Design a protein with these regions (language model features):
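Chalcogenol-based redox active-site neighborhoods
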Residues: 1-178
Length: 178
């Protein structure tokens, strides 16, 4: 499937969310859809696999900015194509992830309800999502997208800077902090 880009609308999807801070299965899961987080910006951060080396460094770094995203009416959602129980076990058993307080999501569906497939970032040769970041406005329109090689991590500070720039509605030169 062709990758969606700036200006494209995110349509119907359903993923299983692991609630912020959850470490046990009791009440840990909630379905997240295109209708969730009404009126909010969504920062959707795909990573390839749980229990890997680069992925937790990104999740922890993004999570350190979770309150900054919230201050901007944005919800941080990090996820992969591993299932929700894998995510919960990883969070509960990883010293750094154990301290995170943001949403994780499991995008295990294939076909029309898969968010990774809809956005065009499911990479079949690896059986995983590419390392992609989408900033989606409250109307579910994609306003920013970046995709990295599976082996290369991202800069959460740059994602926050781009969100700030998008929310101003003004021109924003290179490296300008908002």
């Amino acid at each position: 499937m062709k990758m969606k880009t700036v200006g494209d609308k995110v349509t119907e999807f359903a993923v299983t969310g692991v609630k912020p801070g959850a470490l046990t299965p009791d009440g840990a899961f909630e379905t997240i859809t295109d209708q969730s987080f009404e009126g909010k910006w969504k920062v959707v951060v795909f990573y390839p696999k749980d229990f890997t080396f680069v992925c937790p460094t990104e999740i922890v770094a993004y999570d350190k900015l979770v309150n900054d995203f919230a201050d901007r009416d944005a919800v941080l959602l990090t996820g992969s194509t591993d299932n929700e129980f894998c995510k919960l076990a990883w969070r509960a058993n990883h010293e750094d992830l154990k301290k995170t307080n943001s949403w994780m999501f499991a995008d295990v569906a294939r076909g029309s309800l898969s968010l990774a497939e809809q956005l065009g970032v499911f990479y079949a040769p690896a059986g995983a999502a590419l390392r992609a970041t989408f900033i989606i406005d409250p109307d579910n329109i994609i306003q920013h997208v970046t995709v990295n090689n599976l082996d290369v991590g991202r800069s959460p500070d740059e994602t926050l800077r781009v969100l700030d720039a998008l929310q101003t509605g003004e021109l924003c030169p290179c490296n300008r902090s908002i």
